[in-house]
Amino acid sequence: MKLVNIWLLLLVVLLCGKKHLGDRLGKKAFEKAPCPSCSHLTLKVEFSSTVVEYEYIVAFNGYFTAKARNSFISSALKSSEVDNWRIIPRNNPSSDYPSDFEVIQIKEKQKAGLLTLEDHPNIKRVTPQRKVFRSLKFAESDPIVPCNETRWSQKWQSSRPLKRASLSLGSGFWHATGRHSSRRLLRAIPRQVAQTLQADVLWQMGYTGANVRVAVFDTGLSEKHPHFKNVKERTNWTNERTLDDGLGHGTFVAGVIASMRECQGFAPDAELHIFRVFTNNQVSYTSWFLDAFNYAILKKIDVLNLSIGGPDFMDHPFVDKVWELTANNVIMVSAIGNDGPLYGTLNNPADQMDVIGVGGIDFEDNIARFSSRGMTTWELPGGYGRVKPDIVTYGAGVRGSGVKGGCRALSGTSVASPVVAGAVTLLVSTVQKRELVNPASVKQALIASARRLPGVNMFEQGHGKLDLLRAYQILSSYKPQASLSPSYIDLTECPYMWPYCSQPIYYGGMPTIVNVTILNGMGVTGRIVDKPEWRPYLPQNGDNIEVAFSYSSVLWPWSGYLAISISVTKKAASWEGIAQGHIMITVASPAETELKNGAEHTSTVKLPIKVKIIPTPPRSKRVLWDQYHNLRYPPGYFPRDNLRMKNDPLDWNGDHVHTNFRDMYQHLRSMGYFVEVLGAPFTCFDATQYGTLLMVDSEEEYFPEEIAKLRRDVDNGLSLVVFSDWYNTSVMRKVKFYDENTRQWWMPDTGGANVPALNELLSVWNMGFSDGLYEGEFALANHDMYYASGCSIARFPEDGVVITQTFKDQGLEVLKQETAVVDNVPILGLYQIPAEGGGRIVLYGDSNCLDDSHRQKDCFWLLDALLQYTSYGVTPPSLSHSGNRQRPPSGAGLAPPERMEGNHLHRYSKVLEAHLGDPKPRPLPACPHLSWAKPQPLNETAPSNLWKHQKLLSIDLDKVVLPNFRSNRPQVRPLSPGESGAWDIPGGIMPGRYNQEVGQTIPVFAFLGAMVALAFFVVQISKAKSRPKRRRPRAKRPQLAQQAHPARTPSV
């Protein structure tokens, strides 16, 4: 009987302990297991950067020894009579190698020494040194669930306040997936991300990341961490004398990539190169990154994970060095940012063409709320942004290594980035011909294999969700070639092709610009042969559209752009229908072995185009958005429009109708308006085509020719709607940045809007805004409204309509911390030009109610009412009968706001030029002129389905078969190119792919069932042996055995 009890006890222990057996390995340092509520943490990552006073990065045209660099700088500064300068020593592993930059400290006020340095023939550029701050804070995903465990209770503090400033991965994860209903499901089932993406299939084939060098740029790693067996090198690039990770973020990232136990990474046998680039106080410098990047090139790193980023895509030393890294065959993977769900919030370097930018999803395949959205804003105002992120993967509730062992779960795109980096490392180890692996070929494989998520547009998901096995199939038979991203243009496909699909095109409209990225897997450099060719399909009315091209003269590194402008021909002005055609481009790259005959590799790519054309809408329904006069960070300090939002000090989202004014655009489209974007001066549009010019949050100055033309346009029937923002020089001085460490001031270049410039534009109609700054809630026409840091109307014609409200004086609050209420603040004015056929003008003092960035209450209804007024001359009854109508202010006795003395707007303005004294306008630039491509018509039928799952041209998936291996997992069947399977269905299941959770659950249930059956068998036998013998027929004993084993035939 004792033996039976021991057996039962062992079974119970076995059954209860099996689940946690793996999790206990390597946890001897901890006495207590983590409590359940500690298993999922939200990681708040916030960045800020400042310019270090008197310190500059001197970039050279090549790599030189320290002695040569010193000689160049000394000779350059001799003639400038600057004596107070020195080269700042950099003690790190790259000090013994030649470098392409130097950090100097030069104290001068006139900048003569800097100008002299830039004139030296061996010096490429001189830029300020930047100090980067990162703040990490780990918080519970669900604050309702208590946690008594002390292991993860530490709150990480930065040397600076927790806020997002100039360089940022986001505003933190206050809006992370922990607030989603689906997020709570993840608590019960901790996910192993590597197995979820089926990395174990490749492991069992013998691929584990061996012989692949992967670099982790983060907070370091402890020397004897139990999760890692192949840490090749740890280097420190900070001013602290330690290589260990004092925070845990670097350990987590490394674990997702290469942990070998517990929370397994993707490539446990990869060579880990740990670059410690952040101190325990989360401080770093641009020069630390540059030195570390140079060392990564020297070490021939294959894959580099960079879970940092920020909006400053004009930080030239950093951007240039990233280009150099990828040109040296380093595959860089970077987080796209944590500023979602707002659009136009992509972070650098993930927004670069040569970098794999990664967004985040949860385990239910929903786009994570925190994941930043496209488009890129580099190209504004004259162009249009590119598609980013490239792909998305799991970034919510991902498990990774703890700082001393064990596992924890974190969320963020800084978590999704190492998921892709680990997957790429594993993929690279599967490629037999390593010479075919480069940043372009890997990116081509990832985006061509990605599984598209249903109901999500391309600026949220890029090309779709990472599919590891499909990417393996593509890479295993890859041949060097060029490809396009996106691979087709279908302006009728919603929602994936939003915003293009949201509005048809028509004759007379601004050309629709599609920015396509060219990926060149044939070589680091390339070119487009001849010119792209436009081939319209005549049966599909392709001759009703015309296209123009702008493209990179050189494709470097590994990539370039192809901007396509699409317009409607005059003959289709009254036509409605679908038009199709395609573009052919040929890309050439030099052969790897340069032959005397100059042989090149070439690849020809076809880009299908499909558009919907409608008759030109009436003038009253056409709204023109002024993009040309919107400025943003980078490069200048343009402050936020709502001064209450102290954690977001910069206006950096592009102020475009497809970024932070997306909701307003969607509303206007739903109301039947057609919105076009003007990326050129006012002299470059035909005002007779449009009913209303919409100017919102304008920071730019105006050319004199623009002012004169706009006056003529309004007199001839164009209407003008202006949404302004605050402008007060005293407040601007108050909101400037001061960094205690660097003693550096950041002074705003303008206010929320450039009110002095707007007043010059409006002065011809006796209108203008004041420098008052007001805030408050109010009701207008039975609508609740909020005035967020707006200005008031200072002057308005007497025969106009003016609406007033009672507000708090926010300017007084900011300057003196005093509270005052001001009555009859004029905020809205409506005016009809008295001349026959004249237009109408509307002024409103606040744009925050239209802006998605920090909008509290929208005013879309008001915009509707104002457009009804400007388009049809109908004054809304809700405004004409308002009890808040007052006599228009005359502006008597009020001095108009003046530009702040000493501002640097001319540095970033397209209108002003640098000049001593008052700034002067530049010469008026010529209007953009498009050269339409000569069509080469095709008398053939266009393909019916432009998007099949993206295929690289040289790959025949019929021949791609996963090798056999011993496994209970079903064989993954390759999909043939012509097969109509789930690959062509958004959100479909892979052919031959089974449900991962079910696959992992079946062996557990089988084991439990076997144990229960065994226990039952032992108990029954024990009872039978210990029971007193009774007289009964021997024939019944087999029946007892049959009851115990109904599936067996008992033996007598």
Curated annotation (Swiss-Prot):
What top-level branch of life does the organism fall under? Eukaryota
User: Cofactor(s) for this protein?
Assistant: Ca(2+)
Alphabetically list the UniProt keywords. Answer: Autocatalytic cleavage, Calcium, Cholesterol metabolism, Endoplasmic reticulum, Glycoprotein, Golgi apparatus, Hydrolase, Lipid metabolism, Membrane, Phosphoprotein, Protease, Serine protease, Signal, Steroid metabolism, Sterol metabolism, Transmembrane, Transmembrane helix, Zymogen
Q: Where are the transmembrane segments?
A: 1000-1022
Q: Which organism is it from?
A: Rattus norvegicus (Rat)
One GO MF term on file is: serine-type endopeptidase activity
The segment(s) forming the Peptidase S8 domain are: 190-472
Q: Which residues lie on this side of the membrane: Cytoplasmic?
A: 1023-1052
Basic residues bias locations: 1026-1037
What residues sit in the active site? 218, 249, 414
Q: In which tissues is it expressed?
A: Widely expressed. In adult rat, highly expressed in anterior pituitary, thyroid and adrenal glands and in liver. In 2-day old rat, detected in developing skin, striated muscles, cardiac muscles, bones, teeth and internal organs. Highly expressed in retina, cerebellum, pituitary, submaxillary, thyroid and adrenal glands, molars, thymus, kidney and intestine.
Q: Does the keyword Cell cycle apply?
A: no
Q: What is this protein called?
A: Membrane-bound transcription factor site-1 protease
Instruction: Give residue spans, biased composition: Polar residues.
Output: 877-887
The pro-peptide lies at: 18-186
For membrane topology, the record states: Single-pass type I membrane protein
User: Which residue positions does Phosphoserine occur at?
Assistant: 168
- The secretion signal range is 1-17
* GO CC, one annotated term: Golgi stack
Q: What is its main location?
A: endoplasmic reticulum
Relate the assembly described in the record.
Answer: Interacts with LYSET; this interaction bridges GNPTAB to MBTPS1.
Q: Where is this region: Disordered?
A: 877-900, 1026-1052
Q: Which residues lie on this side of the membrane: Lumenal?
A: 187-999
